[in-house]
Regions:
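Long, charged, low-complexity intrinsically disordered regions
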Residues: 1-95
Length: 95
């Protein structure tokens, strides 16, 4: 696959970042949040992994600035613990 080709992701409330390069994450997370909210999916789980925490910090930085994000927190142990973030969205404004 060409690096410039778009990848289509299922918008189902869970975004697993393990297969993406770090430089893709900022735009990917913001776009995923927009599309999920547009489809009425207002609770998300973003899997960033445990690793060094760099990816988690990047994801949290994007979420902090996103206008549709109401709140976010690390997942409970049964949902991935500190390797995943749970996100609550507000519906997008219409009109």
């Amino acid at each position: 696959m060409n690096a410039d080709e778009a990848v289509e992701l299922p918008i189902d409330g869970e975004l697993d970042l393990h297969t993406f390069a770090p430089h893709e994450v900022k735009e990917l997370v913001a776009s995923y949040v927009d599309e999920a909210a547009e489809r009425g999916i207002l609770e998300l789980r973003i899997v960033h992994g445990k690793g060094t925490g760099a990816l988690k910090r990047l994801v949290h930085a994007v979420l902090e600035r996103h206008e549709l994000v109401v709140a976010f927190r690390l997942a409970d142990e049964g949902q991935g613990g500190w390797g995943a973030t749970l996100v609550q969205l507000r519906p997008p404004r219409r009109g």
